[in-house]
Amino acid sequence: AWEKSLPQITKLTKSPLILGRGIQTNNLRNNIFNDLKNQKLNVNSANLQFDCCYEDISRVKNIISNNNNDSVIAAGGGKVLDSGKYIAESLNIPCITVPLSASTCAGWTALSNIYTKDGQFIKDVALRSCPKILVYDHKFIQTAPSRTLASGIADALAKWYESSITSSKIDDGLVQQAIQISRVLRDQLLIDGGKAFKGQFENNPSWQNTVEACGLTAGLVGGIGGEKCRTAAAHAIHNAITQIITPNKFLHGEIVGVGLLLQLRLEEMKNNNKLADQSIKQLFVLMKELNLPTTIGQLGINVFENNNLEKIADFTCRDKSEIHFLPFEINKRDIIEVISNFEQQKIKT
């Protein structure tokens, strides 16, 4: 896919800046840099120092302005891709995304999540358009640690459980189609996720199905449904946990997965969802198979110390939180109760 994309890239840009982060992807980004140089492009590069944060965004924007770059090529994980999209839009130049793992669908979503430089979630920003080019090359994805695939599976699974409860009654054909895509996506991941995580890359349809589901199909849900296909408690709890978790120790989807289990428990407790417990047990089996955390404690946080439980509840229930997209009322007491019970019990499967 990368080699085939070069003619399209050279039509779009003559002086790109390659944006990345982390030593793990240095070699890949150097290869990308050299390939573009061989196309007679005037290429520069810059590395993020933190997450998708205003400090990094401002610094990279200055680099682009000083170099007169005419595009951003964001090559990396979700926060690199989000940074590239945000920077490109703010400078009114095109963005090209090159995901280097299957941990996220950020490669083509018109959205950037903004964090502090210490990894605390601030807000999400809706962008005017999707990236101009998305290059999803299986050879790049294969170089990523298997942990990133597990994280991507957890994040993609949340699409169904969040959008179906927040948007199922919206009388809009595109929204309903997006919800059904998320249902098929969930089913695909439940079937193939474990096989993809444990299997080989070559001659493994489950691996291909899974990485494309996480990196491509998951992006269709928001792309078709738009802002009406809402996130809900899984991401609201993720955002709250980032306020107190050790920075950069856990991946986005690893935290979202815990939030998803808690959302289902909330549905059972507050909305009398009879199927929620069965869904938890089904997800729990897959998450254990993927070596994903299933409690906040496994994220390195004791919720019963340092007012952590209250901090999570406060941020989860703040004004304009995604938690309020649920079709039933949730308050801080509910969050405290469900997390307390969940952390103390052992899920029986």
Name every feature range the model reports, one short phrase each.
Residues 273-349:
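C-terminal charged capping/lid subdomain of soluble metabolic enzymes
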Residues 2-5, 25-29, 79-85, 104-108, ...:
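Short glycine/serine/threonine-rich phosphate/pyrophosphate-binding segments
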Residues 1-71, 296:
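ATP/NTP phosphate-donor binding region
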Residues 171-289:
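Active-site segments that bind and position negatively charged phosphate/pyrophosphate groups
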Residues 89-181:
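A glycine/threonine-rich phosphate-anchoring loop and its flanking beta-alpha core
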Residues 1, 20-22, 77, 98-101, ...:
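Fold-independent oxyanion-binding glycine-rich loops
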Residues 64-87, 91-102:
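A short, small-residue-rich loop immediately preceding and capping a beta-strand
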